[in-house]
């Protein structure tokens, strides 16, 4: 089958032919329709330090997808041939303390599709049926293909009660931008997002941001004054992994505020702990999606009117993957979709 793979320990990916995956007793085989390019895939493309330490070579990658079940293992129940599915990209052990307690997103033995094992940038993907998630007919293939990052945004944004709250999001990548729409959809009052990329900030405005702030030109304190915020933000969502952004977020938080961290800062990042301790801040780390409560919430929000369509900005045939990666690398894109049906 056709697949997009890392064949050499060097930048780039290669469209190649690989063996169609075998289907285990508890697996489903998915014929891929659409995939989306993730920031993780950009790290793999660039072959940065993280990728060099993490990605097996050779291996085809990718983990954001939607497709149709075409084969099932003999032990699979609850699915049928022809079901349209996306899937949870974190494959968990099922036996550790957290898995047994229903907290599979905290499994200490997680294996990542397209990171630690063969991925979805291919004509077919085999995954455990437990990880497959049926997509309702009213949700498009394009939207279903971005459920993985949409889930990251949902898990992060809905970690705390947002109704009537003032929310600060640092980092206007696709996940941060989707978090804007989620926060507004569930009843936040002011949703402010910061970045230095004007293209992405404009996307955030289209998704409903109260203010989208280029911090290279505008003061967050001035924006807060314009919004008549006298006490600080109630909820902070750090999506960038940039130390200066995290610092500014902590400074802007109200006493008793709650902070969710999805962005990954450098390991030795220093912060002013006075901001955390004396403000009584609650900080929560976010990894992946809650299985499968996050997935149900994603579907429910889309069915109740959440509009994510502006975040999908580019579409290419899978054979034109280089154009898709170029769009992502340019910094002037939202989500980029690759079509495996043409």
Swiss-Prot record:
* Positions marked as site (Important for catalytic activity for the proton relay mechanism but does not participate directly in the coordination of zinc atom): 148
Membership in a protein family? Belongs to the zinc-containing alcohol dehydrogenase family.
Its subunit composition reads: Homotetramer.
Where NAD(+) is bound, by residue?
175, 195, 200, 262-264, 286-287
Q: In which pathway does it act?
A: Amino-acid degradation; L-threonine degradation via oxydo-reductase pathway; glycine from L-threonine: step 1/2
Cofactor(s) listed: Zn(2+)
Q: SMART domains under this entry?
A: PKS_ER
List the catalytic residues: 40 (charge relay system), 43 (charge relay system)
Reaction catalyzed: L-threonine + NAD(+) = (2S)-2-amino-3-oxobutanoate + NADH + H(+)
Any one Pfam family here would be: ADH_N
Q: Which organism is it from?
A: Burkholderia multivorans (strain ATCC 17616 / 249)
Q: Where does Zn(2+) 1 bind?
A: 38, 63-64
Provide the top EC class: oxidoreductase
The identity of this protein, by name, is L-threonine 3-dehydrogenase
> EC number(s) in its UniProt entry?
1.1.1.103
Keywords, A to Z, come to: Cytoplasm, Metal-binding, NAD, Oxidoreductase, Zinc
The cofactor binding remark recorded in the entry reads:
Binds 2 Zn(2+) ions per subunit.
Question: What gene is this protein translated from?
Answer: tdh
Kindly list the positions annotated as binding Zn(2+) 2: 93, 96, 99, 107
Spell out the SUPFAM superfamilies in the cross-references: GroES-like, NAD(P)-binding Rossmann-fold domains
Compartment(s) where it occurs, according to its Swiss-Prot or TrEMBL record:
Cytoplasm
Q: InterPro entries, from UniProt?
A: ADH-like_C, ADH-like_N, ADH_Zn_CS, GroES-like_sf, L-Threonine_3-DHase, NAD(P)-bd_dom_sf, PKS_ER, Zn_alcohol_dh
Please give one Gene Ontology molecular function term for this protein. Answer: zinc ion binding
- Which PANTHER family does the UniProt entry name for this protein? L-THREONINE 3-DEHYDROGENASE
Q: Which GO terms describe its cellular component?
A: cytoplasm
Protein's job: Catalyzes the NAD(+)-dependent oxidation of L-threonine to 2-amino-3-ketobutyrate.
What Gene3D superfamilies does this protein's entry cite?
Medium-chain alcohol dehydrogenases, catalytic domain (3.90.180.10), NAD(P)-binding Rossmann-like Domain (3.40.50.720)
Q: Which GO terms describe its biological process?
A: L-threonine catabolic process to glycine
């Amino acid at each position: 089958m056709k697949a997009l793979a890392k064949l050499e320990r060097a930048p780039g990916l290669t469209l190649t032919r690989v063996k169609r995956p075998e289907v285990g007793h508890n697996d489903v085989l998915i014929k891929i329709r659409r995939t989306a390019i993730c920031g993780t895939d950009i790290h793999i493309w660039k072959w940065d330090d993280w990728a060099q330490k993490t990605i097996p070579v050779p291996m085809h990658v990718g983990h954001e997808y939607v497709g149709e079940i075409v084969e099932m293992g003999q032990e699979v129940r609850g699915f049928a041939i022809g079901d349209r599915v996306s899937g949870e990209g974190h494959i968990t052990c099922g036996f550790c303390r957290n898995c047994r307690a229903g907290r599979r997103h905290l499994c200490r033995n997680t294996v990542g599709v397209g990171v630690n094992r063969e991925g979805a940038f291919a004509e077919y993907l085999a995954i455990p049926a437990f990880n497959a998630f049926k997509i309702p007919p009213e949700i498009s293939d394009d939207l279903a293909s971005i459920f993985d990052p949409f889930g990251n945004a949902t898990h992060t944004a809905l970690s705390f009660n947002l109704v009537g709250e003032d929310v600060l999001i640092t980092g206007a990548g696709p996940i941060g931008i989707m978090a804007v729409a989620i926060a507004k959809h569930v009843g936040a009052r002011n949703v402010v997002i910061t970045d230095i990329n004007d293209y992405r900030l404009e996307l955030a405005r289209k998704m409903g941001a109260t203010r989208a702030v280029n911090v290279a030109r505008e003061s967050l304190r001035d924006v807060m004054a314009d919004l008549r915020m006298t006490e600080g933000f109630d909820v902070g969502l750090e999506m960038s992994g940039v130390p200066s952004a995290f610092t500014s977020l902590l400074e802007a938080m109200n006493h008793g505020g709650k902070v969710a961290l999805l962005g990954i800062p450098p390991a030795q990042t220093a912060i002013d702990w006075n901001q955390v301790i004396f403000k009584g801040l609650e900080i929560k780390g976010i990894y992946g999606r809650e299985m499968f409560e996050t997935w149900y919430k994603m579907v429910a929000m889309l069915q109740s009117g959440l509009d994510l369509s502006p975040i999908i900005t580019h579409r290419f045939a899978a054979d034109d993957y280089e154009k898709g990666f170029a769009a992502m690398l340019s910094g002037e894109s939202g989500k980029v979709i690759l079509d495996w049906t043409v």
